[in-house]
Structure formats: C-alpha cells, structure tokens
Amino acid sequence: MKICVPTMGEGGMQEAVCQHFGRAPTFTIVDLDIGVIKVLPNVSEHMGGTGLPTETIFAEGVQVMIVGGLGPKAVLAFNQAGVVVFVGAAGTVNDAVDDWRAKMLAQADLDNACKDHKH
C-alpha cells in the first residue's frame, strides 16, 4: 500500500507534514509493502508549474493520503479517483503514519475540508 503525505522538504520519514496540501513543497510517498520512501517535488500550478497536485499523486498509484488539511476540490478529486484521504496529521511523516495506523485521524469529507487558505 502506498501512502502519501504532503511535506516541507526532503527529510523522508522525519520531514515535517505541510499543513497546506496544494502548496506543499514536496510529497513523501511511503510504500508499506516494500519499505521504500520516495520524495517528489510539487511541480503543480500551485508552485509555478503545470497541472494539479492531485495529478502527481495519482501518477504514483497512491491509495491513501494523510494530510493536515485540504480543500473541497481536492477531497472530491481524491474521492473520484478512489484515494482515501485522512485529515488532522501533524508533526513528522512518521508521526502521521503512526497516527493513521492508530486510527487517530478523521477520514476527509466536504464537512471537514478547509474552506479558506488560513491553515
């Protein structure tokens, strides 16, 4: 299973979770099946590039997103693609994955999506 966490840099499991999904500098992908960690730059239009951040995630075959927060458009895009999203992550990638495993994070929906960019 591949899990993705929006992150502040390239520190792998010890990197800080970025609280703004679309503007995360990087995405850290953890493949739980084979123990591989991959860090991808966010090259979406949000960061001066092209495309949407969700497209980067879809291309990697991610099944679970663990985020601090994200907007309703991203929630809908992930839902339509079959990617399950959990909100409320904080700390490091390692902390976020541990919290997800412990069922401490809420599944994302339109009610708990961010309504503005003040997070």
What are these regions (language model features)?
Residues 1-47, 59-60, 80-81, 88-119:
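Non-catalytic interface/targeting segments
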Residues 44-81:
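Short HxH-centered metal-ligating active-site micro-motif
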